[in-house]
Design a protein with these regions (language model features):
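Alpha-helical promoter-recognition and RNA polymerase-docking modules of transcription initiation factors
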Residues: 1-141, 148-163, 172
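Conserved small/polar residues in nucleotide/adenosyl-binding loops
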Residues: 178-180
Length: 180
C-alpha cells in the first residue's frame, strides 16, 4: 500500500467538525493568535513574551484547536488538490500546498462573522494551490501577476471563440480584456 493511500485512509477516519465545534475551535485559535501577535509585535522578546500560566495554557489549547481544525478539513484539501492534478505538480505536492492554505485559513478565520469554516477555507486552499502552480509548475517562473493576466487572456479568447466560432483577432482580444 502506498503512502498516499495510507494518508487518504487516515484523513478519512477523522470526524468533520459540527458548526458549533468550528466556532469553539475558531475562538480558541483566535485567543492564541492574540497572545502570539502581542509577542511578535514586541520584537519576540521582553515582557510581552512572558506569558502567565493561564496564557501558556490558552496557547496550548489554541494549538490543539488549530491542529484539530486542520485535521478535520484535510479532505477538503485533497478534494481541491485532485481538481488541480495534471497541471504541473504531483498530487502530494498539491496537497502540501493546499494544506499551507488551510493552515492560513485556520489562523485568519473569524468565527464572529458567522460563516462556516469550510466556506472560508475553500478560498485560502485554492489560493495556495494556484500560487504553487504559478510559481512551481514551469521551468521558467512567471510572476504571479503576469500569470493572472495570462489566465484572463485565455478565458477571453475561449469566450470569443465560443461566440464567433473562429479565433479572435488581437484587436478583439484587447477590446474584450478592457471590459473585464
Amino acid at each position: 500500500m502506498s503512502s498516499l493511500s495510507d494518508f487518504l485512509g487516515e484523513i478519512g477516519r477523522h470526524q468533520l467538525l459540527t458548526p458549533e465545534r468550528e466556532l469553539t475551535m475558531g475562538r480558541k485559535v483566535q485567543e492564541m493568535g492574540v497572545l502570539i501577535n502581542r509577542c511578535q509585535e514586541a520584537g519576540g522578546k521582553g515582557p510581552a513574551c512572558e506569558y502567565s500560566e493561564a496564557e501558556r495554557k490558552k496557547i496550548k489549547i489554541g494549538e490543539k484547536a488549530k491542529n484539530e481544525m486542520i485535521t478535520a478539513n484535510l479532505r477538503l484539501v485533497v478534494n481541491l488538490a485532485k481538481r488541480y492534478q495534471g497541471k504541473g505538480l504531483e498530487l502530494l505536492d498539491l496537497i502540501q500546498e493546499g494544506t499551507l492554505g488551510l493552515t492560513r485559513a485556520v489562523e485568519k478565520y473569524d468565527p464572529a462573522r458567522g460563516h462556516r469554516f469550510s466556506t472560508y477555507a475553500y478560498w485560502w486552499i485554492r489560493q495556495g494551490l494556484n500560487r504553487a502552480l504559478s510559481t512551481q509548475s514551469r521551468t521558467i517562473r512567471i510572476p504571479v501577476n503576469i500569470n493572472e493576466k495570462l489566465t484572463k487572456l485565455r478565458s477571453a479568447k475561449s469566450k470569443l471563440m465560443q461566440l464567433k466560432g473562429i479565433p479572435p483577432t488581437g484587436d478583439e482580444l484587447a477590446l474584450s480584456l478592457i471590459h473585464i
